[in-house]
Amino acid sequence: MNDAFTVDDLIACYERGVFPMADARHDESIFLIDPERRGVLPLDGVHVPRRLARSIRGEPFEIRIDSAFDSVVEACATARPGRLETWINTPIQRLYGQLFARGLAHSVECWDGEELVGGLYGVAFGGCFFGESMFSTRRDASKVALIHLVGRLIVGGYQLLDTQFITEHLEQFGTIEIARADYRRRLGRAWTAQADFYRLAAGATGAEVLQAISQAS
């Protein structure tokens, strides 16, 4: 696919359970992925490792929401040691920027002073949140961002957190793998639900986020 693939096409893809990827950062093509097995993180079964919970309570970073979306996507698209290639190319980056402009994409950011040291971004429709990518230049920064995201989704009334695939990194938090048919059933229910990404206050503490997760389990 090329520039003829629009942001409205992308929204339609999400609604039917398909997501975009590129082979490489400098490959302009977009491929649509519809895996037989899908990673999801059940919001009523999130596990926060004890050491990470202690760190989150200690407020190691300032958490900001949607303050530097483009910078988060750019950081996720940047090659780093251990991750020499990325699936985020320029057309995909542009499409997510358009979703953000419509209020349909969000970032959770970890800041140390005025330095962005970690974060994640994803797409929200109805009661669904599709986690797209995360990055970290400091220990635990992406994990802290994920836990703050989870707390925000729980408080906001979301029903589905789609991680696309399951990885060892995500598995430690309770991510599971489900069949395509099961995923589509869950997607259909959550898509029409009402949720509010901003229901949790922007300055919510780590303790408040952990409490929300605990109450949902």
UniProtKB/Swiss-Prot annotation:
Major location (coarse): cytoplasm
GO BP terms in the entry: protein catabolic process
Keywords: Acyltransferase, Cytoplasm, Transferase
EC category name: transferase
InterPro entries (alphabetical): Acyl_CoA_acyltransferase, Leu/Phe-tRNA_Trfase, Leu/Phe-tRNA_Trfase_C
GO CC list: cytoplasm
Pfam families for this protein: Leu_Phe_trans (PF03588)
Record carries keyword Cytoplasm: yes
Recorded catalytic activity of this chain's protein: N-terminal L-lysyl-[protein] + L-leucyl-tRNA(Leu) = N-terminal L-leucyl-L-lysyl-[protein] + tRNA(Leu) + H(+); N-terminal L-arginyl-[protein] + L-leucyl-tRNA(Leu) = N-terminal L-leucyl-L-arginyl-[protein] + tRNA(Leu) + H(+); L-phenylalanyl-tRNA(Phe) + an N-terminal L-alpha-aminoacyl-[protein] = an N-terminal L-phenylalanyl-L-alpha-aminoacyl-[protein] + tRNA(Phe)
SUPFAM superfamilies according to UniProt: Acyl-CoA N-acyltransferases (Nat)
Location(s), subcellular: Cytoplasm
Domain of life: Bacteria
Gene3D superfamilies, sorted: Leucyl/phenylalanyl-tRNA-protein transferase, C-terminal domain
Endpoints of the signal sequence: none
EC number: 2.3.2.6
GO molecular function: leucyl-tRNA--protein transferase activity
Family: Belongs to the L/F-transferase family.
Role description: Functions in the N-end rule pathway of protein degradation where it conjugates Leu, Phe and, less efficiently, Met from aminoacyl-tRNAs to the N-termini of proteins containing an N-terminal arginine or lysine.
Annotated NCBIfam families: aat (TIGR00667)
Protein name listed in UniProt: Leucyl/phenylalanyl-tRNA--protein transferase
